[in-house]
């Protein structure tokens, strides 16, 4: 597993620029950063990201990916990175968890709700902290590999539609009973 993965819309709230800066600061010669996503509304922001990354041969922009290509990227990455400032329940984070990936995530409530006791937490909008977490994953992978299993288990217990529907039905039954 030789790369970190960012997957999502390339917009400022999701902070791909902080991730690029942090990855370059981490300076891991044997690792890459794959940026999978696009922004058709603000192409100038994508151009800014490409300019930011142009000094590094280790940062790859794929554009938007779908279906099997998305799965292939998620299956093979060392860690999924979600450095967002503002986020609802991120579908890409749930997808990364369902592939059993370690997740480097900003410590915002939505990410904490999804990951629970898992996750390599970074302070949002803190390039130095994010860089340290990128290095931490590369150098301590064996110590945190348990998170892969935990993330799969958490997805099955909390985010599979059948489970969610059963929990919701139980909740409604309790309300009606009271």
Predicted feature residues:
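Conserved donor-binding/catalytic core segment of Leloir-type glycosyltransferases
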Residues: 1-14, 19-24, 34
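A short, well-ordered alpha-helix in the C-terminal region of glycosyltransferases
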Residues: 143-158
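Short alpha-helical donor nucleotide-sugar binding micro-motif in glycosyltransferases
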Residues: 64-65, 72-77, 168
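Aromatic "clamp/platform" in nucleotide-sugar-dependent glycosyltransferases that forms part
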Residues: 85
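Conserved acidic donor-binding segment of nucleotide-sugar-dependent glycosyltransferases
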Residues: 120-128, 136-141
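Short hydrophobic beta-strand element within catalytic cores of glycosyltransferases
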Residues: 102-105
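Nucleotide-activated donor-binding/catalytic signature segment of Leloir-type glycosyltransferases, i.e.
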Residues: 46-68
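A short hydrophobic beta-strand element within the catalytic core of glycosyltransferases
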Residues: 19, 80-81
